[in-house]
Amino acid sequence: MAAVSLRLGDLVWGKLGRYPPWPGKIVNPPKDLKKPRGKKCFFVKFFGTEDHAWIKVEQLKPYHAHKEEMIKINKGKRFQQAVDAVEEFLRRAKGKDQTSSHTSADDKNRRNSSEERSRPNSGDEKRKLSLSEGKVKKNMGEGKKRVTSGSADRGSKCLKRAQEQSPRKRGRPPKDEKDLTIPESSTVKGMMAGPMAAFKWQPTATEPVKDADPHFHHFLLSQTEKPAVCYQAITKKLKICEEETGSTSIQAADSTAVNGSITPTDKKIGFLGLGLMGSGIVSNLLKMGHTVTVWNRTAEKEGARLGRTPAEVVSTCDITFACVSDPKAAKDLVLGPSGVLQGIRPGKCYVDMSTVDADTVTELAQVIVSRGGRFLEAPVSGNQQLSNDGMLVILAAGDRGLYEDCSSCFQAMGKTSFFLGEVGNAAKMMLIVNMVQGSFMATIAEGLTLAQVTGQSQQTLLDILNQGQLASIFLDQKCQNILQGNFKPDFYLKYIQKDLRLAIALGDAVNHPTPMAAAANEVYKRAKALDQSDNDMSAVYRAYIH
């Protein structure tokens, strides 16, 4: 893009990296965010995403002059929402100007007409006016006394009764009032709040819950679709209590039982995502004495109202971990509205524990580091039971210093951890591990069905395998699932199929054949077609018997 003459407050199209040009506004940067050295650049707040970044002047174009051109190039839904947000911003700004001008004109007219009406025409009218004014003043004085006296009595009684009945914290609206409020669009609301609105990262002051665990700072969790499943592990070790505001708080029920070999870090820990793995991880972090703040995306997906966002968790914590299902969820968590990137400031740390491809994790690392943050990828090998038991295997790559800072956290959640070098290495290794595991599971299911159709005992086959070189906890558990017909998820089938797909793509990228993984992937795809996605990976067995 060609260089243009721009100034503070201008609406622009800004291009950041490989992303398409996006509408934004030039604003003042926060005080703690230094301007990068080198070429001239402006600090731009983007519409629709509520994101912001330093953009070189040659990557900027005036909004109005290039609006039609940009709209023709970009057709995405989020892009259209961003353009709508700009237009809404302009309409409101224009309406505000018109309202102020009309108001001043109307006030002037009202004053003039009032002066004309109040001007008496004769001495008699003056006397009549004086007498009537005296009566009015007298009546008003008596009425005022009565009203003031009655209002004061009623007011003091109401105030006293309200103070006795209401346990709410001062300054917070009650839950019922919150529910009745129609929320304004977050995008437009953020834009109309002023240039610095997105940069206020101050945490909301909250009073500590009575008898709360001192290691637990505050909990940002709303209800989910399946609380009994999602939080089964965490609620065994934690007690849930409702705060007066209606938000849910968690404190460790056995926080005193801290492992003597683990000295918890004094850093504030954030955790985003409480799925099968996340619940157990958070439970163990709390048990070992860490200060934890959590947020779960499921409630937001269902349309529930969350008091806080991933951005605020990141801004109030020193190290924030995230564990979500797939590359799209990982990107949305970081780059979406009120996402992780909004809370990143110099020195803030982000650890992504999701199993994703190397390209995705590299992209996330770049945007986090570009904001002055520190990044570590740390996908975990294991299942729900191992997560609950604190026996996961952690594969880390990226910032070595951050890896060391996470030492006590990794000890709490896993039995061992590996540092694999630069960002992307852990993602590749994790996909290879899960490729082997997924292919092995498909082979187990194939063997059991072959035993059945040839008249052999499946239980005897399992006994033989358990006495041989293939004996393992994984083999025994998955075979027991199949024999008992119990496919309660310990590792979702849809996720192992996703990992197989990503592993095959990894092989394709380096021209390496993966025929075994490809064959296993087809079996899992058939199982998904049979509605087994949300069952355990061992439900792949059903793909062979249908």
From Swiss-Prot:
SMART domains cross-referenced by the UniProt entry: PWWP
Q: Which GO terms describe its cellular component?
A: nucleosome; nucleus
Give a yes or no for keyword Phosphoprotein in this entry.
Answer: yes
* Self-association and partners: Homotetramere. Interacts with MAPK14. Interacts with KDM1B at nucleosomes; this interaction stimulates H3K4me1 and H3K4me2 demethylation. Binds to mononucleosomes. Interacts with GATA4; the interaction is required for a synergistic activation of GATA4 target genes transcription.
Major subcellular site: nucleus
Origin species: Mus musculus (Mouse)
Q: Where is the PWWP domain?
A: 8-66
Residue numbers for the site described as Required to promote KDM1B demethylase activity toward histone H3K4me1 and H3K4me2?
Answer: F216
Sequence segments annotated as region (Interaction with histone H3): 213-216
Question: Basic and acidic residues composition bias: which ranges?
Answer: 91-145, 161-181
Gene Ontology molecular-function annotations: chromatin binding; DNA binding; histone binding; NAD binding; NADP binding
Q: Which UniProt keywords apply?
A: Chromosome, DNA-binding, Isopeptide bond, Nucleus, Phosphoprotein, Ubl conjugation
Residue ranges for the region (Dehydrogenase domain) are: 260-546
Question: Source organism lineage?
Answer: Eukaryota, Metazoa, Chordata, Craniata, Vertebrata
Instruction: Describe its function.
Output: Cytokine-like nuclear factor with chromatin gene reader activity involved in chromatin modification and regulation of gene expression. Acts as a nucleosome-destabilizing factor that is recruited to genes during transcriptional activation. Recognizes and binds histone H3 without a preference for specific epigenetic markers and also binds DNA. Interacts with KDM1B and promotes its histone demethylase activity by facilitating the capture of H3 tails, they form a multifunctional enzyme complex that modifies transcribed chromatin and facilitates Pol II transcription through nucleosomes.
State where NAD(+) binds.
270-284, 355, 498
Q: What subcellular locations does the record give?
A: Nucleus; Chromosome
Cross-linked sites for Glycyl lysine isopeptide (Lys-Gly) (interchain with G-Cter in SUMO2): K135, K175, K178, K200, K210, K226, K236, K239, K268, K301
Which PANTHER family would you find in this protein's record?
CYTOKINE-LIKE NUCLEAR FACTOR N-PAC, OXIDOREDUCTASE GLYR1-RELATED
Q: Which residues bind DNA?
A: 167-179
Please state what the protein is called: Cytokine-like nuclear factor N-PAC
Domain commentary: The A.T hook DNA-binding domain is required for the interaction with MAPK14. The PWWP domain is a H3 reader and strongly binds DNA.
- Ranges for the region named Disordered are 91-187
By sequence similarity, the record places it as follows:
Belongs to the HIBADH-related family. NP60 subfamily.
